Amino acid sequence: MSTYNWDEKHILTFPEEKVALSTKDVHVYYGKNESIKGIDMQFERNKITALIGPSGSGKSTYLRSLNRMNDTIDIAKVTGQILYRGIDVNRPEINVYEMRKHIGMVFQRPNPFAKSIYRNITFAHERAGVKDKQVLDEIVETSLRQAALWDQVKDDLHKSALTLSGGQQQRLCIARAISVKPDILLMDEPASALDPIATMQLEETMFELKKNFTIIIVTHNMQQAARASDYTGFFYLGDLIEYDKTATIFQNAKLQSTNDYVSGHFG
């Protein structure tokens, strides 16, 4: 790896009208340690972008910065701009909870509430004051349909979500996240705990979801990135090295380091 010039970058950009979210000079620190090193990146609307790189490359830390999940870590500090609809959501006066309604998150392992399937979807809406059962029913059905789960659970909505399979639980978590109608859905290795069949079902769900949402996914699975994304960004040691169309990254990467990583020669 000593032969690579890590200062050499190739970063795709988009016309402003196509951009759903962007970052400018984003750094993330854990105490005095710099985990993310000044990343400029744009995400195209209604596309799936995969973030890849070795363990410790910073891709999950960067993803978590996009809706300020790093705020939950006492020693974490994020600098730079995270721009959504022209607003820097990294500013201290931003209401983080309101912002996360627009930029949602699905975590690595399914984390359904210990409630019914129905109340997993309605819980946040009920807390926000929605009481009309017809409205709640519509939210549940629409969200579960979008997450490709409705047909499997429509007769069991009042059963515990914990009785679902791992793949079904993850799609329920997706349904819960999209029920508040975010523009952007962040996914941190959402298939890592799933078997191959559930993984394929999740990817098929993602293809449908991108009609209505912009999806940014972290994955260690090169085959998944190649299959399921429109764009791919390669991270290494806290830096974005190459960002381009997925087909280009996997078939004709501009940088030797990227080509060697996706072909399994290091990492």
From Swiss-Prot:
State which Enzyme Commission number(s) the record gives: 7.3.2.1
Disulphide-bridged cysteine pairs: none
Q: Does the keyword ATP-binding apply?
A: yes
Residues binding ATP are 53-60
Kindly give the InterPro entries that the UniProt entry links to this protein.
AAA+_ATPase, ABC_transporter-like_ATP-bd, ABC_transporter-like_CS, P-loop_NTPase, PstB-like
Asked if the keyword Nucleotide-binding belongs to this entry, the reply reads: yes
The record places domain ABC transporter at 21-262
Provide GO CC annotations from the record. Answer: plasma membrane
Major enzyme class: translocase
Where found, per UniProt?
Cell membrane
This entry's Gene Ontology molecular function terms read: ATP binding; ATP hydrolysis activity; ATPase-coupled phosphate ion transmembrane transporter activity
Query: What membrane topology term does the record carry?
Result: Peripheral membrane protein
Which PROSITE patterns does the UniProt record give? Answer: ABC_TRANSPORTER_1 (PS00211), ABC_TRANSPORTER_2 (PS50893), PSTB (PS51238)
Sorted alphabetically, which keywords does the UniProt record give? ATP-binding, Cell membrane, Membrane, Nucleotide-binding, Phosphate transport, Translocase, Transport
Please provide the Gene Ontology terms (biological process) for this protein.
phosphate ion transmembrane transport
The reaction(s) catalysed by this protein are: phosphate(out) + ATP + H2O = ADP + 2 phosphate(in) + H(+)
CDD domains from the UniProt entry? ABC_PstB_phosphate_transporter (cd03260)
Oligomeric state and interaction partners are given as: The complex is composed of two ATP-binding proteins (PstB), two transmembrane proteins (PstC and PstA) and a solute-binding protein (PstS).
Which family is this sequence assigned to?
Answer: Belongs to the ABC transporter superfamily. Phosphate importer (TC 3.A.1.7) family.
Q: What does this protein do?
A: Part of the ABC transporter complex PstSACB involved in phosphate import. Responsible for energy coupling to the transport system.
Protein name stated in the entry: Phosphate import ATP-binding protein PstB 2
Q: Which organism is it from?
A: Streptococcus pneumoniae serotype 4 (strain ATCC BAA-334 / TIGR4)
Read off the lineage from the record.
Bacteria, Bacillati, Bacillota, Bacilli, Lactobacillales
